[in-house]
C-alpha cells in the first residue's frame, strides 16, 4: 500500500508495471484470490455500471422517489440528436452516462459507488464515453477501473472521499481525478502524466461544497457528476498534451483535505447551507419532509 501518489508513480516506473497491474497485485495479496478472480470481481463492478447507464438512458429514463430528479438524460439525448451541442457530441455522451447513473441512484436503483454513491456517475460517464469513441476493449475498461481504484485509495487515505468530511470536492472531485488519471494511463500517458491529470482535476474543483437540497443525493448532486466527467476528460487531455500541474499532486490532495476540513458544517452534507439553504431549497425540503413541527409530531 502506498502513502502517496509519488510513491505509486515511482513504484510503477521502477518495476515497469502499469497502475492496473499494481492494484491487481495488491488486491491478490490482500484477498488471497487469483488474478483471474480479482479481475472477474472488477468486471462485475463494470457490469453494474453498464446496467445503470443503460437503465438511465433507455426510453424516458427513471425518476426519483421525490420526483425532483429524473428524465433529464432523455431531454439531453433528444437535444443532442437535433442540435449541434455546444460542448460537442462526444462530451454529451459522457454527460449522459454520468447523469443516467446518478438518476438511477436517486431512483433507488443499483449503482457502483465510485468512490461514493453521490459521485457514482463521474467515472462511468467518462469511461463509457471512451468506450464508444475510442473502441476500448473490456480488458482496457477493467484496467481503467483498477487504475482509478489505485489513485482513489491514496486520496482516501490522505484526505477523504466523503462529502460529510471534505465537501463535494472530496466526492465528485476525487472521482473526477481518479477518472482523469486512469484515462491518461489507458491511452499511453506516462505515470507522471497520470499524476498531473489527477492534480489538475482536483485543482479545477477545489473548494466545491456539499449542499444537497433536503439532504438527498439529487439536487445538485446529479448534475455535478456531469461536470465531474467532463472535467476528468479535459484534465486527461491537458496532461496528455504535456501540460503539468505546477503544484505536485500530493500537495494538491493535502490542500483539498485542508480546504474540506475548514468548510463549515453547513457546507458538508448537512443540507443546511449553499443551495440547500436557499428559499427554494428550504421549500423543497418542507414539501418532502414537512416542517420541523410535523416531524416531531410524526415521531
Where are these regions (language model features)?
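Glycine- and small hydrophobic-enriched segments that form the cores of compact globular domains
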Residues: 86, 113-120, 132, 136-137, ...
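Short acidic, glycine/Ser/Thr-rich loop/turn "cap" segments at secondary-structure junctions
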Residues: 106-114, 127-130, 160-165
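Alpha-helical support elements that line or immediately flank enzyme active sites
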Residues: 124-135, 180-188
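Acidic-glycine-rich active-site phosphate/pyrophosphate-binding loop
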Residues: 88-105, 140-159, 204-212, 247-250, ...
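A structural signal for small-residue-enriched, beta-sheet-centric alpha/beta enzyme cores
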Residues: 163-176, 180-186, 191-299
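Conserved phosphate/anionic-ligand binding catalytic regions in large, soluble enzymes, centered on
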Residues: 108-126, 170-175
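Conserved active-site and cofactor/substrate-binding residues in soluble primary-metabolism enzymes
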Residues: 33-48, 89-96, 106, 121, ...
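Generic N-terminal targeting/processing segments that precede catalytic cores or assembly contacts
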Residues: 1-109, 133, 242, 249-299
